[in-house]
Amino acid sequence: MTPLDRSCWTRPYHAVFDVELIGTHNPVFLVCVSIVELGKRAAFWWHRPGDMAKLRKLLSNDAFTWVGFNSWKFDLPIVSYAMAGADPTQLKDLSTRLIDDNIMPWEAETLFGFEMLTVDHIDVFNVAPGVEISLKRYMGRMGYPSLIDMPFHHTKDLEPREYPLVEKYCFNDVGGTTWLLKKLKTELDLRVDMSAEYGIDLRSKSDAQMAEAIIKKRLELKSFGKKNPPPFVSYSAPDFIHTDSPIILDQIEKLGNTSFTVNPGNGSPEVPEFLAEPVKLGYGTYQMGIGGLHSTHDVSLYVEASDELCVSDFDVASYYPNVIMKAGLIPAFGAGKGERFIAEYTSIYHRRMEAKHSGNKKVANSLKILLNGTFGKLGNIYSAFYAPDLMLAVTISGQLNLMCLIHDVEKVPGA
């Protein structure tokens, strides 16, 4: 694979945009745009003569990268339909289907008879660190100067005198998105670098989405929408889990004898009742689960270093990826692709360790995203990597391994 030039994924200017559609019988349609680098902004109303033509001209300018928040699933389909000639009533119908029925853009194209615009576009919704967090919450966390709620219900038919309030609200959201765009510069720069390396547009993807897109391309895997989860999955401890603790051995036996029910809705294994009970181990108590191990005895802890006491924090490099490799967990992709997956994953791991030890942070960070993001997709029912048995094996084995370490450390005199 020949890396592409970084310039393939960058444009001179960022056009941050937001869309408003308000009303039922006589809806109004507004697009607000701010050109970040030029400090210019403009509002485009459907009812105002010439505005849609001006917006169309702006959209055709190849110097712009269009940036929005959740814009891939809402704003861009709406603007695309408007540029295809739809009026506000038709746009409102599309808006309702996008929001209430959660239809995807490609479904909207078929149902409403338009094509998505091919503008250069970044949606920062998945790039931002939270999951399903609103723009207003990000604005609050960043200390944005003003938080404005829409002063009207989205079904209200507005009077012309009320239009300026809608425009003020829309531009405030554009400003918040602009702040978020700047806040995410490091994350977006990394995505541009990785897009150039792998030849895929990764700029709007979360870490896990990037990992899936890259490895899918390398292995030529296909996605077929939502998977049919199995009714149950089981667990078997890998060979590297060994201990003389009767408590841990009892947990291993219970886990091995359990059929974990898989939720048919989200595809995740459900926690059996016995895992809800805290485990007493040495000096502490611990809560196991599908997600991870949590201590319950040290809700608050204060330790001060001194001449006699050293406080250390040890980081385990790529913990879950190491569990995947050392346990020999191979996805059932068929046609030898599971084995190729593990080989590719192991190669990525060794490349990351080399980059980390040599001080190449850019490469190390990008490969870390691939490693951790891939694990994150094992439990996603929509992912090509969906494997609830492997997700369970990774998380449970990781917890048992930590418990074995805790047990061994507490046997050391003075620990």
Residue ranges of predicted features:
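N-terminal accessory regions of nucleic-acid-interacting proteins
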Residues: 1-12
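A short catalytic or substrate-binding loop motif that flags glycine-/basic-rich loops and adjacent residues
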Residues: 9, 23-27, 305
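Two-metal-ion RNase H-like nuclease active-site motif
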Residues: 12-22, 122-123, 312-314
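Conserved beta-strand and immediately adjacent loop positions that scaffold enzyme active sites
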Residues: 13, 30-32, 310
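Hydrophobic side chains in beta-strands
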Residues: 19-21, 35, 373
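Short, flexible loop/turn motifs enriched in small residues
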Residues: 23-31, 365-366
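Short conserved beta-strand segments at catalytic cores or DNA/RNA-binding microdomains
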Residues: 27-39, 317
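Conserved acidic
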Residues: 39-415
